[in-house]
Amino acid sequence: MTSFLHAYFTRLHCQPLGVPTVEALRTLHLAHNCAIPFENLDVLLPREIQLDETALEEKLLYARRGGYCFELNGLFERALRDIGFNVRSLLGRVILSHPASLPPRTHRLLLVDVEDEQWIADVGFGGQTLTAPLRLQAEIAQQTPHGEYRLMQEGSTWILQFRHHEHWQSMYCFDLGVQQQSDHVMGNFWSAHWPQSHFRHHLLMCRHLPDGGKLTLTNFHFTRYHQGHAVEQVNVPDVPSLYQLLQQQFGLGVNDVKHGFTEAELAAVMAAFDTHPEAGK
């Protein structure tokens, strides 16, 4: 086993899986979601987000930070490939907020070929991300540990949807075109630097739980969900409490020389928002 895979399985608290099967893919997908949180703090600090293998390994594994789709799915792709999976990245367009025009390709997801079938894997869409791979098949509802999803197809375009109560909500659309590392670098740069990017205006975090629950944070507003229902909502009273919550609930490492952050740095980030703890968001 390579040193990278050893560090990866250690980070996931997961026994090494050496055979590329659908069941192994499911196990790794959920373990990754539960161990490595979605978070955008580096965009706000601000720090440049690097996508090369060394940078992702240092930040997500050794510094015990999280990241967003370009980082999380980049790391997941490398781990799957090193295990022996046939995997490559795709790029999607986020349509969750019903944009008036088609947005650019700013969401990284994965296409995995295993056991003579194609599967979509995605550990990087925040609170609504998949926690299990989906078979690349249209109009079939597929259950995951954290909700029901389906894929729809319009020509060469696929649309990922999740069930919200009695309705289906579109998340993003994509095709199966081959993407290059430069495409990810461009999408990553746009996501981090476009003035209207959602990542530049909110502190966002999510960590999924093995029992079907999840923890989310939007600025000072912390929510614990179980089976799709909010069971705890807290307005974090101040930055010191928030600093502790990021470590205790989301497992963020704060002490790494390069990727850690101080309470004062977090305070500077939160002061830039037009939001107050008592307001909730």
Swiss-Prot record:
Organism field: Salmonella typhimurium (strain LT2 / SGSC1412 / ATCC 700720)
NCBIfam families to which the protein is assigned, alphabetical: PRK15047.1 (NF011621)
Claim: Acyltransferase is one of the keywords in the record: yes
Keyword Acyltransferase in record: yes
Active site, per annotation: C69 (acyl-thioester intermediate), H107, D122
Function per UniProt: Catalyzes both the acetyl-CoA-dependent N-acetylation of aromatic amines and the O-acetylation of N-hydroxyarylamines. In vitro, catalyzes the O-acetylation of N-hydroxy-Glu-P-1, and the N-acetylation of isoniazid and 2-aminofluorene.
Protein family according to the UniProt entry: Belongs to the arylamine N-acetyltransferase family.
Taxon lineage: Bacteria, Pseudomonadati, Pseudomonadota, Gammaproteobacteria, Enterobacterales
Subcellular location: Cytoplasm
GO cellular component: cytoplasm
Location, primary (coarse class): cytoplasm
Name listed for the protein in its UniProt record: Arylamine N-acetyltransferase / N-hydroxyarylamine O-acetyltransferase
Keywords from the UniProt entry: Acyltransferase, Cytoplasm, Transferase
Known EC number: 2.3.1.118, 2.3.1.5
SUPFAM superfamilies for this protein: Cysteine proteinases
